[in-house]
Design a protein with these regions (language model features):
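Compositionally biased intrinsically disordered regions enriched in Thr/Gly
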Residues: 1-259
């Protein structure tokens, strides 16, 4: 069943991209033309690919409200890229029926940003809150997608790095306030919240289950997201590492953040 979406803006452009023509902008308005545009391009993906922000609004029932902002790409491999993004968005908007009464009210509100786009990878982050009527309070959360543009597979932290005790040690020594596009705490509280992630305060360590640790890439570094105590003001915490500080643990042959 098609997703209910609305367009929020003109297509966003990566640095150095030429302005899209009026005809190209119009082509982004329908999924069918996304497919045609993809078919007419070569299999090579470049940083000239552009996108527009859309809003996913399909609610699971009439009691609920869903607003999830997401990027819709056009250009080469757009159909495959958009399918991966939309699958994540639909998952964010869904409820496990075994955990809740029939047709509960759910309000979901998420923003998103493309944090890195080049010929090798697209990295997208979503952040916002979910309020379910049977829950004590709304929860805040962050989701991330890192799409390898050659394999069209999702890339996780453990695909990128050897996450071991040495990596964890470097994290707590070198991590810094991530600034744009999303931070769950103020810069003034960053050191305090980082300390709360150490084994002195948090057991098991968030790095124990690195498979599920969320991350997104930026031009200069990688941002890791981990759970936080709700009473501290947010349900998640983010910290950034420069690629140069963790190069010894990097696994892939290709350098994703370089063209």
């Amino acid at each position: 069943e098609p997703a209910e979406t609305v367009s929020l803006s003109e297509p966003e452009h990566m640095e150095g991209s030429a302005a899209a023509s009026v005809e190209e902008r119009d082509r982004t308005k329908t999924d069918a033309l996304h497919k045609n545009d993809t078919a007419n391009n070569s299999s090579e993906v470049t940083s000239e690919n552009t996108y527009e922000m859309r809003l996913y609004t399909k609610a699971p029932n009439q009691n609920s409200t869903i607003k999830i902002q997401y990027p819709a790409f056009y250009g080469s491999k757009a159909e495959e890229i958009n399918s991966l993004i939309l699958a994540k968005v639909q998952d964010m908007a869904s409820l496990d029926p075994s955990l809740f009464p029939e047709n509960p009210r759910i309000d979901v509100n998420y923003q998103s940003a493309v944090t890195l786009q080049n010929s090798k990878i697209i990295s997208v982050v979503f952040w916002g809150n979910t309020d379910i009527e049977v829950s004590q309070f709304p929860t805040t959360d962050l989701y991330a997608l890192n799409i390898d543009l050659t394999s069209l597979e999702l890339i996780t932290l453990k695909d990128l790095y050897t996450v071991n005790a040495e990596f964890e040690k470097v994290f707590f020594e070198k991590a810094f306030f991530p600034s744009d596009p999303i931070t769950s705490y103020s810069e003034e509280k960053f050191s305090e919240m980082l300390k709360l992630q150490t084994s002195e305060y948090t057991l098991p360590s968030p790095f124990t289950n690195a498979d599920s640790m969320r991350c997104f890439l930026k031009p200069e570094g990688i941002v890791l997201s981990m759970p936080a105590i709700h009473a501290s003001g947010s349900d998640h915490f983010e910290a950034e590492l420069l690629y140069s500080d963790i190069q010894d643990y990097y696994l892939p042959e290709q350098i994703y953040w370089n063209e």
